[in-house]
C-alpha cells in the first residue's frame, strides 16, 4: 500500500459506520471521529449514540460531537488533529470553508448516487422513485456547495425491479468502502484525477417526508409501486381506510385497463388487494395496520374484510 494517511472521519448512521469499519482495518490511521450528538431514540426516548460513535469508541478513537462546525473553537478541534484528509460519509453537518481547507488533501465525501444526479439528502430513495435503471456511489472532493465538488471515483450499480431502498442501501454500503480505499490510495500517491460535475445534468434529492408517503391514487400503478419500494424501510407508504392508516410494504403492477375511479377497490382475495390507479392496477400483497405486524393481504382480509369490499374507495 502507499503511504499511510492521517484521516479524520465524519459520519453518523450505519451507512457511515460501514465505511469507518473498512478504514479501521486498512493501513491508514484514523486520528479522530466527528459524529452527530447523541439523540433520543426508542420507546423510552433514551439518549443513544450514533453507530459511528459506538464503533469509534470500541477502537478507542477520540470522538467529537459538535452541534455545528461554524464556531472557531469547534474548527480548532479539526485543525488540532493535523490530518492529511477528512473523509465525510452521511455526517449531517455543513463543513464551512475553513474546515474544508484544513486537511492537507482537503475533504472527500462518499455520496450514494452517480453525481451530478441526485445531489442532496435522499439520493437512494429518489433514484428508485424516479424509475432510474442504475445508481451508484460517487466519491468527490468537497467544496462549499451541496454535493457539487469535483468527482474522484464513480461506481455504478443496476437498480433491479425488486430493489427497495433497504436493498439498494446495502449494495451501496458494500460498494462505497471499496471505492473509498481506492480513492485514498490515489490521493496518497498523487495519482487522483478530479473531474468537474456538469451542472446542466444535476437533479436534487430532497429529504423524504411522511406526508409524501401517502399513496396518491391519481398516479399510475407503476409510479405507486416504485413509491412503495422507495419508501421501504422509511417512512413506508400508506393509505387510509376507516380513518386508519395502513402501511404498504409490497405490491405489484397489473397492466390492465379499468373503468373505475382511481382508489377504487376492484378485487380482494388471497392474491392481493387490487386497487385502481390512474393507469393500471396496483395489487397490494403485504400490509401493516396501525399497531400490528406486517402481514399478507390474505391475513388482513381474514380479520378486516369489511375494509376491502370491491367498489369501496381507499383514501
Swiss-Prot record:
One of its GO terms (cellular component) is cytosol. One of its GO terms (molecular function) is methionyl-tRNA formyltransferase activity. It comes from the Bacteria. It catalyses: L-methionyl-tRNA(fMet) + (6R)-10-formyltetrahydrofolate = N-formyl-L-methionyl-tRNA(fMet) + (6S)-5,6,7,8-tetrahydrofolate + H(+). It is an enzyme of class 2 (transferase). (6S)-5,6,7,8-tetrahydrofolate binds at residues 113-116. Disulfide bonds: none annotated. Its EC number is 2.1.2.9. Coiled coil: none annotated. Belongs to the Fmt family. Attaches a formyl group to the free amino group of methionyl-tRNA(fMet). The formyl group appears to play a dual role in the initiator identity of N-formylmethionyl-tRNA by promoting its recognition by IF2 and preventing the misappropriation of this tRNA by the elongation apparatus. This is Methionyl-tRNA formyltransferase. It comes from Pectobacterium atrosepticum (strain SCRI 1043 / ATCC BAA-672) (Erwinia carotovora subsp. atroseptica). The gene is fmt.
